[in-house]
Amino acid sequence: MLRFGVNQKTSLLLTALLSCGLLIFSPVSQSSDLNQIQKQIKQQESKIEKQKREQAKLQANLKKHESKINSVEGELLETEISLKEIRKQIADADKQLKQLEKQEREQKARLTKQIDIIYRSGINPSLIERMFAQDPTKAERMKVYYQHLNQVRIEMINNLKATQAQIAVQKKAILSQQKNHRNQLSTQKKQQQALQKAQQEHQSTLNELNKNLALDQDKLNTLKANEQALRQEIQRAEQAAREQEKREREALAQRQKAEEKRTSKPYQPTVQERQLLNSTSGLGAAKKQYSLPVSGSILHTFGSIQAGEVRWKGMVIGASAGTPVKAIAAGRVILAGYLNGYGYMVIVKHGETDLSLYGFNQAVSVKVGQLVSAGQVIAQVGNTGEISRSALYFGISRKGTPVNPAGWVR
């Protein structure tokens, strides 16, 4: 006797029903399946929305921590400047103290010599009285000499006392400065601890963010969105810069016309005005004529794969956190702030068509609209944005298209 499993029985039953034309798909069955699919779609959409909210929250926390690091870095710079000034004051005070101590030793030596002269001469009031009885004229001369020696000795003693008083004041000042120095060091240590804590929080947030963005497609979408946001921000910033330059050039032309009319002499522009006039020149042809904005090893080259089909539109240079970032050429700052994916970003406009971009910074040192010169410090290397180690993102754009920066820098 043959035994059939459940699946075999079901299969035979379906075959029989189909052969008899008794099995049909009713509208009720189709509607149920559609409802189930729609339910699954809604659940998936809800899940995606939840992930997006979590990602937005993490991005906000990341920006908050990086802003805190930026603030603490500024405080550390101020403390370092203050400490340098205090150390200079202590060094100056110590130098003055050594001069006073040398002066004290010399005064003591002169006073000792003077006392020795008086002692060896044997001159004293009782001797002078006896000489008056014997030879008044000689006694008078001896009296004047004795008074002179005594006056010199008194002046030496007074000078020595004054020097010793100055030494006491100087030592007190040094002790006070040393106390201030210790307080400043303590403050700096606390600031460094606060910075380390903020960096740890930043790293923790970044790790959590990377975990949520583990899927390549999610990261790819994020990178595309960041890239698009950067393009839009550049377009907006370029337009604003063009309008600002136009206003400034018109104002300069009016000043030049008015000044030449008033003085009947050719107008001599200021340093800033000359910088404005020279800002029309771009970066020129790619001849490796500029220095790198920061020294370090090249972690990613232009055109190498960043994620999926997205490629790096610039180079990434590894460097220690806090390393000064320098503008490669003169120009106008059109962006100085935080951008998702790029962290604290500075973009400098060179002429009408060229831009240089500096990202992943932990702090920026310039403002939008500011004219900068070649080699001027504009930021500090960091690991803001979506990068796990301290490095600088450096790119060049010409006529709105990213180009390989390696052709311009050496």
From Swiss-Prot:
Gene3D superfamilies reported for this sequence: 6.10.250.3150, Glucose Permease (Domain IIA) (2.70.70.10)
Basic and acidic residues biased stretches: 236-263
One Pfam match: Peptidase_M23
Composition bias type Polar residues, residue spans: 178-187
Name under which the protein is recorded: Uncharacterized protein HI_0756
Biological processes annotated in GO: septum digestion after cytokinesis
Membrane-spanning intervals of the chain: none
InterPro entries assigned: Cell_wall_metabolism_enzyme, Dup_hybrid_motif, Peptidase_M23
Spans annotated as Disordered: 178-203, 236-272
Low complexity: bias regions: 188-198
Alphabetized GO MF terms: metalloendopeptidase activity
Natural source organism: Haemophilus influenzae (strain ATCC 51907 / DSM 11121 / KW20 / Rd)
PANTHER family per UniProt: MUREIN HYDROLASE ACTIVATOR ENVC, PEPTIDASE-RELATED
PROSITE patterns from the UniProt entry: PROKAR_LIPOPROTEIN
Origin: domain of life: Bacteria
